A protein has these predicted regions:
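Short glycine/proline-rich turn/loop motifs
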Residues: 47-49, 208-212, 303-312
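Extracytoplasmic gating/loop element in the C-terminal half of outer-membrane beta-barrel translocons
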Residues: 248-346
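Glycine-rich, aromatic-lined ligand/substrate-binding cores of catalytic
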Residues: 218-255
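Conserved small-residue
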Residues: 22-24, 109, 126-221, 252, ...
Length: 393
């Protein structure tokens, strides 16, 4: 039959969660302590307030609607699973700055609301099924979108632009913002749009919490589209598996490598080959000059210009990628061969894991977008090549 099976599912829920594990409960937390005394013989037990009462703190809550479809066609040679969800989160917990009433300037509170929706799709097909040849395909696609609809916090400009991802009302959770780069001046010093609308090199207030009209929204730091595509081909005793993964929709902050001063021990990246060198170069390049001692003496706070350049819109790349995740080729020897060797089974397999990237942003200059900015002690995603001989008796 054309339609093999069909099932529909739907659910709606209201759930509550205690929030982050590091957030204390709404009651005061009082713990025993041993106050310091000059001599060990004068010790005594006391009590200390570990956390003040936070009576207005309540659970994080979420309304969620889920709709799903699972259908099969042509004797289940084609199987499709589709799920859609919509969520409304409210009373989300975060830090809030207060007037100091109650003894704390900053404390945890229910400060945010967020709406989100997403789609998850899985498609499995048996494309060809013959005696000596088979071909199967498995395709997975996931899309998500969210928006912070209410937020009562005071966040500094520096937090929005560093690249870790901060939330602003009207944008996705974990968004990246940048200073607007306005080109190099005649000396090769970078210039930017200031909050008052003027063009400046050093009048950038990284600790600003109110007027941030000069920031440019770049996008979320988390991908909005993820998935995979796998194909398995079988011909007689051979099996070829080709598996790819993909991710789109996020942005990454390039490494903050520029400074108003360098030492002989500084490793210069390849961007410096295209830097400003002579008057007029500001018309051909966006890479600032290596500031001289005289420029550092004549221009006060010159370090601000280079810090701002690190966090400008020209230092942002797309985090999109398509990766060849795995390629494997195996061969199962015929029973006639293994029986002659007094074996019940014999197979040989070659497998390559993470062999190469099919696509990534050229701004990353070959760096892995999945590994980018994960930290200096993080281990990059390794390339693995294995050859396996399997023998059974």
């Amino acid at each position: 039959p054309a339609l093999s099976h069909l099932s529909l599912k739907a659910s709606y829920s209201l759930t509550a969660d205690r929030g982050p594990s590091y957030v204390t409960n709404s009651l005061a937390v009082i713990k025993a302590s041993t106050p310091w005394r000059p001599t060990s013989g004068d010790t005594e037990t006391g009590l200390k307030v570990s956390s003040l009462e936070n009576a207005q703190l309540t659970y994080e809550k979420k309304h969620e609607l889920n709709l799903g479809l699972d259908v099969g066609f042509v004797n289940n040679r084609i199987n499709l699973a589709f799920d859609w969800y919509k969520r409304n989160n409210f009373d989300l917990i975060g830090t809030v700055t207060t007037q100091g009433i109650g003894g704390e300037i900053s404390k945890y509170g229910n400060v945010a609301e967020m709406k989100s929706q997403g789609v998850e799709l899985s498609l499995f097909t048996r494309n060809i099924e013959r005696k000596d040849f088979k071909w199967q395909t498995n395709f997975i696609f996931a899309w998500m979108d969210n928006e912070v609809t209410k937020l009562k916090t005071m966040t500094r400009m520096i937090d929005y632009i560093t690249g870790t991802g901060y939330s602003m009302e009207g944008t996705p959770r974990g968004s990246l913002f940048s200073l607007k780069f306005k080109g190099l001046n005649e000396m090769g010093i970078p210039t930017f749009l200031a909050a008052d609308g003027s063009i400046t090199s050093t009048n950038i207030q990284f600790q600003e919490t109110v007027n941030m009209s000069n920031l440019v929204y770049e996008g979320p730091v988390d991908p909005t589209i993820t998935g995979s595509l796998g194909n398995i081909f079988k011909w007689k005793g051979f099996t070829l598996n080709v598996f790819m993964t993909y991710s789109f929709g996020n942005v990454v902050r390039l490494d903050p490598i520029f400074s108003n001063g360098y030492s002989d021990l500084t490793a210069m990246p390849r961007e410096f080959a295209n830097r400003y060198l002579n008057p007029g170069d500001e018309r051909r390049t966006n890479v600032p000059v290596i500031a001289s001692t005289r420029q550092n003496n004549d221009i006060s706070n010159l370090y601000v210009a280079y810090s701002a350049y690190n966090y400008s819109d020209v230092r942002v790349a797309k985090g999109d990628f398509i990766r060849m995740k795995e390629i494997s080729l195996s061969y199962d020897f015929p029973q006639s061969v293994s029986s002659k060797l007094r074996m019940s089974g014999l197979s040989l397999k070659f497998q390559a894991t993470n062999p190469f990237l099919i696509y990534s942003d050229k701004k990353l200059q070959g760096q892995d977008p999945e590994f980018f900015n994960t930290g200096g002690v993080a281990v990059p995603m390794p390339k693995q090549f294995t050859l396996t001989l399997r023998v059974s008796f």
